[in-house]
Amino acid sequence: MTAQIRLAEPADLNDDTLRARAVAAARGDQRFDVLITGGTLVDVVTGELRPADIGIVGALIASVHEPASRRDAAQVIDAGGAYVSPGLIDTHMHIESSMITPAAYAAAVVARGVTTIVWDPHEFGNVHGVDGVRWAAKAIENLPLRAILLAPSCVPSAPGLERGGADFDAAILADLLSWPEIGGIAEIMNMRGVIERDPRMSGIVQAGLAAEKLVCGHARGLKNADLNAFMAAGVSSDHELVSGEDLMAKLRAGLTIELRGSHDHLLPEFVAALNTLGHLPQTVTLCTDDVFPDDLLQGGGLDDVVRRLVRYGLKPEWALRAATLNAAQRLGRSDLGLIAAGRRADIVVFEDLNGFSARHVLASGRAVAEGGRMLVDIPTCDTTVLKGSMKLPLRMANDFLVKSQGAKVRLATIDRPRFTQWGETEADVKDGFVVPPEGATMISVTHRHGMAEPTTKTGFLTGWGRWNGAFATTVSHDSHNLTVFGGNAGDMALAANAVIGTGGGMAVASEGKVTAILPLPLSGLVSDAPLEEVARAFEDLREAVGKVVEWQPPYLVFKACFGATLACNIGPHQTDMGIADVLTGKVMESPVIEVLG
């Protein structure tokens, strides 16, 4: 049974006066407020494309009727033969990944046809705790974009293996779940904790079940008994798919799938698997998860996921159904996801079913965008609470080196950028510090939230190419500590101090110079600058990092830098405490295994 999200908003459609007006307009006894004519309706129930006109009263669809049979309306929108679809619903995403404010994000996606997002603000939660989630709830007020918040379940994502800016237990989750803006528990990344009935994670899941709200998952690599156990605990969705086979296994298991666009190289495999079925399961929804600012500016949000899926061979009707009706059913929102009398008038008119360029966008019956431009003002929110998150002093070059006795050591290494595994190598020691092994990349993490001493912990990566500079970032999932990658300690200190000096963000240094910087003074995650400005700076960063290391797609890519500290994933990961391994639950404070001489 679909969890029913207890939100206040759907009640606005139950106003007796509104319903009376809608009934009268549907009968022809009074005119519509808005009439969309001349369009081809995308029927996400039957899969048909059929001519139809849509009459709207207030926020409510009053009538879907024969073309040109009515002309009585205060406002007429001529669709001109274009395709009329329900507004797109993004079932799992993080606004912070686009490095802009919710207001700027709304301006970017609403004009493209996205009318609802399900936002997990766990980046703000990991930096600011409950205050960060409270700010997110305030920031979405009165936006033309409907944002359903989820309560961050993993703050931090790997307790005991990393330290962030807060620690959410079941009591805090229960309080968050009582807020009307909160639609459920966000992706549960501590999979082992759920499966092994860790009291903390069991309590968090139970808080979601008791609130009768969604309990969303992060089931990377789970299968067979572990997957069943994860679901039996109460988790009902997943977006962490790694192959077409994984997709099919999780569909058969009964999970709701949030098919994400952030791993483009996997989408053709997913499309092939769905096409083999011959129908679209009702449990397939779509999400963006993470979209970088330059990608958002150039490609868009969920509209880009729909566009790419169709390009890879998915039927447009299927892609739209996944992004509308299936999503609404997942959310328990019977007012959304369908163009039918009695439903909410969240509507987008697409030019065609290939490029999915939005000609008109209506949100709750109000025209909010036309021709890719917003028609309404978007309110902003005070950001004072998000400032001042860099609670650490400037770094010295020696802070990034590993101390050791002797002349030679055996080191533990973190091998491969994805699906990491333990490795070993030998290295020389000079002046009390380990000399980085040939071909290894240093990764250093420094706690920045004031919850522990800001001691830098350094490890060694293999398979990351040869670095002739450094990249520093405070966007480092999920605790968002100061993380620096590099080939030498001098450039690492330079990049780190540039980031500290701007109150958080990203910087690249090479040969003793800072070559690119993106200030993110809000939480060390977000800028209050316009999307266009942030996107340009991020593009410059991509280019600058590409000059200090040679990427090897699909796994050794710029994006890998932001997930290298994700300690909840299987395998060794560097954190502010050392090299952490979620399977053993242990942290290796120094990579030095043994002094050899």
From Swiss-Prot:
Q: Which cofactor does it need?
A: Mn(2+)
UniProt-listed GO biological process terms: adenine catabolic process
Q: Which domain of life is it from?
A: Bacteria
Please name the InterPro entries in this protein's record.
Adenine_deam, Adenine_deam_C, Amidohydro-rel, Metal-dep_hydrolase_composite, Metal_Hydrolase
Q: What reaction is this protein's catalytic activity?
A: adenine + H2O + H(+) = hypoxanthine + NH4(+)
Q: Which residues form a coiled coil?
A: none
Q: Which cysteines are joined by disulfide bonds?
A: none
Instruction: Supply the SUPFAM superfamilies for this chain.
Output: Composite domain of metallo-dependent hydrolases, Metallo-dependent hydrolases
Q: What class of enzyme is it?
A: hydrolase
UniProt keyword list: Hydrolase, Manganese
Pfam families assigned to the protein according to its UniProt record, in alphabetical order: Adenine_deam_C, Amidohydro_1
Sample GO molecular function, one term: adenine deaminase activity
Q: Does the keyword Transport feature in the UniProt annotation? A: no
Q: Which family does it belong to?
A: Belongs to the metallo-dependent hydrolases superfamily. Adenine deaminase family.
Annotated protein name in UniProt = Adenine deaminase 2
Q: Which organism is it from?
A: Agrobacterium fabrum (strain C58 / ATCC 33970) (Agrobacterium tumefaciens (strain C58))
